[in-house]
Amino acid sequence: MRYRIILLRDNQRPGPPSLIEAIYNNRLAIRDQGHEIFGVFGSLLGLATNEVYLVTYGETELALQLPDSITTVSDRAFMPTVRPTTHEPASSPGVYVFRWFSVNPSTVQEIANLSAAAWPDFESSFDTRVQGLFAEDQTAPETMLLITWYRNLTVWEASRHPPQNARDNFLRRHKLTLNALPIATSLLSADGHNLVSHR
């Protein structure tokens, strides 16, 4: 299963309402093209207020029909590594952190293994759940993406001090990455309907 991480920007307005409306208007076309919406995520920290991430999953290419005021800043395809093993929309309110890693392609599998070893202790210690760890869909991926759900920003801050086993694995993982960029977001909806649950 391929995940698309699409960064959209409204060039005329400072917030996300028009972006949400545009995605809402594309929801049936997205499904007709063989994709489901994993989530639409707006800024908390690190993303501009007039930008959102649209995350979909499917095996085909995807084209959106957007108004002239909205720009597709980036559209990148990623493949799951050790998570997710099943594919369903995000649904829990809270904080979703997109942590972008620059990596050497030769370290992708080891990074995935270290992450999987750390997560059980990490998740049992905090109100958090790893949504997925992805590698860019290329022969030699140089970018990985970790999406983690936290109940709130307080939990995210507390999770910086994980149990020893998780800490050790995270430190080993950190040494394998070239840099990391965390972006905190929240799950958005439109017209009172959760965009990720139109079934």
Protein language model regions, located:
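Surface-exposed interaction/gating patches
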Residues: 2-13, 82-153, 192-197
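An amphipathic, aromatic/His-enriched active-site/gating alpha helix that lines ligand/cofactor pockets
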Residues: 15-51, 55-83, 117-131, 137, ...
